[in-house]
Amino acid sequence: MVIALDAMGGDFGPVVTVPASLQALSLYPKLRLLLVGNPDAILPILATSKSIGLDRLTVIPARSVISGDARPSQAIRVSKDTSMRVALELIKSGRAHACVSAGNTGALMGLSKLVLKSVHGIERPALTTLLPHQKQGKTVILDLGANISCDGAMLVQFAIMGSVLSKQILGVSNPRVALLNIGSEETKGLDNIRHASRILHTISSIHYVGYVEANDLLMGKTDVLVCDGFIGNITLKTMEGVIRVILSTLQSSEKKNKLNWFMQIINSWIRKYLFKQFNQFNPDWYNGAHLVGLRSTVIKSHGAANQHAFIAAITQAMHSVEREVPEKISHQLSTVLSKNNH
């Protein structure tokens, strides 16, 4: 399997992506990587490495990088020879099976549509991630910011794609699908949400369970949670912020303790237990958002991802390719559209 990596994208660029690439090669013996970016920034880091698997890594030169604050429309116009564009073109030319980038989200979405095209029947691809919940499973949640405004038909498309992802990546045989809403009653919510709900009730191949509220996000009440990108992005980042504060507080509280030795032991045990419970929700463990709805696999890593988190994104790309997620989304969508047209 060959994956193209945008080595220059994200807040840290090659400082994170190159070491992460080397570690991924040591973890996955059958993996080959195409590291796209400025050789002057990449090669010095590689020169200091003694990692195994260097023979499975190729540096592909790219002159420039799309900045994180660039407007997507402008970035796309001047994207030629950027690390992101070159990485995507490697998929189009057949040299790579997937692409991973921590770069500008809007530019990645626009360029992916331009270079790789959407699956037939998908209006716009969506950003999705696999969010852990308290029942030791994971929930597919989409959209996470690729589409700020969505009509009911788009939400239905997201539901279909999320259901396929849950089956293929998580192995859920009959995924429960829900819409994120402000209440569980059918009369609640905006027109587009209620419209999507009515359509989903009519699709027999989708196990639609109705509405789920944000306070149930980590409770495991659904396998797929669908929302527009505006709500999804705010919801995810709020949850990630809270989890990081909790983990940071648990780690730092030991230094502030002035209890007697017995209470220190009890307090330490409780703190370690809580840390273990909350650490499963650490955003680093589930980094890597799929751009589902494209004809090939593209994974968006968090811009501030550390080395461990970027490896998680590479792993997500491998799983998507191995399980033929884009092809199966296309098949499922064509089946649903065919039934609805009869």
Swiss-Prot record:
InterPro entries: FA_synthesis, Phospholipid_synth_PlsX-like. It is found in: Cytoplasm. It comes from the Bacteria. GO terms for cellular component: cytoplasm. Its EC number is 2.3.1.274. Transmembrane segments: none annotated. Homodimer. Probably interacts with PlsY. Catalyzes the reversible formation of acyl-phosphate (acyl-PO(4)) from acyl-[acyl-carrier-protein] (acyl-ACP). This enzyme utilizes acyl-ACP as fatty acyl donor, but not acyl-CoA. This is Phosphate acyltransferase. It comes from Blochmanniella pennsylvanica (strain BPEN). The lineage of its organism: Bacteria, Pseudomonadati, Pseudomonadota, Gammaproteobacteria, Enterobacterales. The gene is plsX.
